[in-house]
Regions:
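Divalent metal-dependent catalytic cores for phosphoryl transfer on phosphate-bearing substrates
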Residues: 1-3, 9-13, 19, 166-167, ...
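Conserved catalytic alpha/beta cores of large enzymes that bind or transform nucleotide phosphates
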Residues: 106-117, 186, 238, 244-248, ...
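Non-catalytic interface/linker regions that flank or bridge core catalytic/transmembrane domains
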Residues: 1-163
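A glycine- and charged-residue-rich anion-binding loop/surface
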Residues: 118-119, 126, 163-166, 170-173, ...
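Active-site-adjacent "gating/activation" loops or surface patches in catalytic cores
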Residues: 42-56, 139-159, 165-216, 220-221, ...
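Short, glycine/acidic-rich hinge or "gate" loops at secondary-structure transitions
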Residues: 32-35, 188-193, 244-253, 449
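Regulatory modules associated with amino-acid/nitrogen control
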Residues: 2-59, 132, 140, 278-598
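Short acidic (Asp/Glu) and glycine-rich catalytic loops that position anionic groups and cofactors
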Residues: 1, 51-56, 96-102, 111-117, ...
Length: 598
């Protein structure tokens, strides 16, 4: 794309200008305010010194052998490791000039030199390189003369509403996040979990190499997914640097699957044992799980400043520990949720009895609740729901509509309890989206006596929890809309201009999850352009095709929606091939019509 080429050139030129400006200003300071020889001199080794807090060469011609460029950064790394009294904050301007000259004269890439490979491996294998050495290597484009893939990444923008940084900057920030969280005080539980897992990794260097290569193949436009291309590059790199074959395979696997953890956590029903077991079979063992968790979290946190939130933290934590349990039990054993059910029931029952509600009434009500309800909801949520349901009179035919703060701190939780009827989910969703409400997650469930027990996590247009001023009228609108079923569904707000700039091909994909059909469930993912009314449209197609929604996971990445659904046909069975084909056709046609309307 011309705009991509323009922006890449723009970033490249601005970086060079910034580099030259910094170098020239430093020379001016030398000439005006001080003398070159008056600076405090510290000898690092036989090749490098520091002038005050800037590293310099002893011999200005040393970079005639370009491998010595890497030795410069290895010296910085080793000083950081030793916590030396010699402090370095940057590179002396004449040294920068000599590096620039050596780069221009270089033929080929440094990784072709076995001496350079040995030095680079020492740098990336030492986490202390992330304190300063890698920052300076990134700043002065050293990776562009080492890795053949790197020059194409420098300044490459990702034209979406998700990625804030260029590809090279994002990769550097991913590596920096790994170091920062693992070596600093934890600010929250998610960072503490990351730190605990990181500390148990057998080789930290493999995580840094995986981070270096996870997006290295972006922008090649050759029809293959960047994860597939990158895994090949990672394997070639590891073999070239003579890593053990087991390490080569692990790094290549991590790059290939670096999106799988987030896809599973955000798009699929992670409380379904079949889903967890299928994911555990992909992961294979605890080592792969630990590496993948750390890489995924670092990748997300290095994407933009708002992507990692407490809602995603909770999902990732749940998937991590569920998968860990599945791996330890082995494929022949299903995950035992009985203790989770017991703990949540006991916690809720204690609070209900404390509130003066008789235990017999509670247990009588709970007989109508399925096990999945007690797995998916915490003790506090079960208490909140049960307390209100016991005070509710179903004979009035007025739905029970409750609002509260989400247990994950992100969003407002909406709980609806009422007698089920055809199209009720579509009606709920249509009302919400017509008021500009975004749905982060939907848990659809029926009791044994045919009452819906649907939970939604909602945010406003700015991604914030709903204010009290919005909740009160929304509650009234939901009540009226669910009671007056003859009223037509509200129309969604038009697609904003910023979304109209994006073209995303709609895809309806049925997942092949082993054992899912036997449980009467089919898993489907729908990827398309995010737009107002999308979820309402999807649910209306399900209704038209007589499909029941058992669970929904709504994942929005910038302008892209990747929604996952657990569904069954009107007989409560998994969809046949014929039913899948019919649903796919109807869904794609409906999405195409929505595109034309916008």
């Amino acid at each position: 794309m011309p705009v991509e080429n323009f922006m890449s050139t723009f970033y490249f030129i601005t970086r060079r200008i910034s580099e030259i400006n910094e170098m020239v200003l430093q020379f001016f300071r030398e000439a005006i305010f001080s003398n070159h020889n008056s600076r405090k001199l510290n000898v690092i080794n036989s090749k490098f010194v520091t002038r005050d807090d800037l590293i310099d060469t002893i011999d200005p011609t040393i970079f005639n052998d370009p491998v010595e460029i890497l030795n410069l950064f290895l010296s910085i790394t080793e000083l950081s490791e030793k916590n030396s009294q010699i402090k370095i904050v940057g590179i002396y301007p004449s040294c920068v000039r000599n590096i620039r000259t050596a780069k221009r004269n270089l033929k080929g890439f440094l990784q072709n030199d076995p001496r350079a490979r040995e030095i680079f491996l020492k740098i990336i294998s030492n986490p202390n390189s992330m304190r300063l050495a890698f920052k300076l290597m990134h700043k002065y484009s050293i990776l562009s003369i080492y890795l053949p893939q790197w020059p194409n990444l420098v300044g490459q923008m990702q034209f979406d509403m998700f990625h804030t940084y260029t590809v090279d900057e994002h990769i550097y920030r991913t590596m920096k996040y790994i170091f920062d969280v693992s070596h600093n005080e934890s600010r929250d539980n998610s960072e503490q979990l990351f730190k605990n897992i990181y500390n148990n990794l057998p080789k930290h260097s493999l995580l840094y190499i995986s981070a270096l290569f996870h997006d290295v193949a972006k922008g090649r436009h050759n029809g293959r997914h960047h994860a597939e291309e990158g895994s090949v590059d990672a394997m070639d790199f590891c073999r070239l640097h003579k890593l053990p074959i087991s390490d080569c395979r692990l790094v290549s696997w991590l790059v290939l699957n670096h999106l799988e953890f987030s896809k599973t956590a955000l798009r699929r029903d992670i409380y379904d044992p079949i889903v967890v077991q299928d994911f555990a079979e992909l992961i294979k063992d605890e080592i792969h799980l630990n590496y993948l968790y750390c890489l995924t979290v670092a990748d997300i946190c290095a994407t933009n400043d708002t992507e990692w939130n407490s809602w995603k933290q909770a999902l990732f934590r749940e998937l991590y520990f569920s998968t860990l349990q599945a791996i330890r039990l082995g494929p022949e054993h299903s995950i035992d949720w009985s203790q989770t059910i017991k703990d949540n029931q006991e916690e809720a029952l204690t609070e209900l009895c404390r509130a003066g509600i008789k235990k017999e009434r509670v247990l009588a009500l709970w007989k109508n609740f399925k096990d999945q309800y007690f797995i998916k909801n915490s003790g506090n949520q079960i208490f909140w729901h049960t307390n209100n349901i016991l005070a509710y009179d179903p004979a009035t035919n007025v739905p029970l509509v409750l609002f509260g703060q989400s247990t994950n701190k992100i969003g407002t939780e909406l709980f609806i309890y009422t007698r089920d009827y055809t199209g009720i989910f579509c009606r709920i969703v249509s009302i919400l989206v017509s008021k500009g409400i975004s749905i982060l997650e939907a848990s659809i469930m029926n009791s044994k006596d045919n009452f819906i027990m649907d939970t939604f996590i909602l945010v406003d247009r700015q991604g914030r929890s709903l204010s009290h001023d919005k909740i009160v009228p929304l509650q009234k609108i939901l009540l009226m809309g669910l009671i007056n079923t003859e009223h037509p569904l509200p129309k969604p707000v038009p697609l904003s201009k910023k979304f109209q700039q994006f073209k995303i091909k709609s895809v309806v994909q049925f997942l092949d999850i082993k054992g899912a059909d036997e449980t009467g469930v089919t898993h489907v993912e729908i990827s398309t352009l995010d737009r107002p009314g999308l979820l309402a449209l999807i649910s209306s197609v399900f209704q038209k095709c007589r499909i029941n929604i058992n669970a929904a996971r709504i994942a929005t990445t910038g302008e892209r929606a990747d929604d996952g659904f657990s569904i069954s046909n009107h007989q409560g069975k998994a969809l046949s091939q014929e039913e899948k084909g019919h649903l796919q056709t109807q869904m794609l046609e409906a999405l195409h019509r929505l595109d034309e309307q916008n």
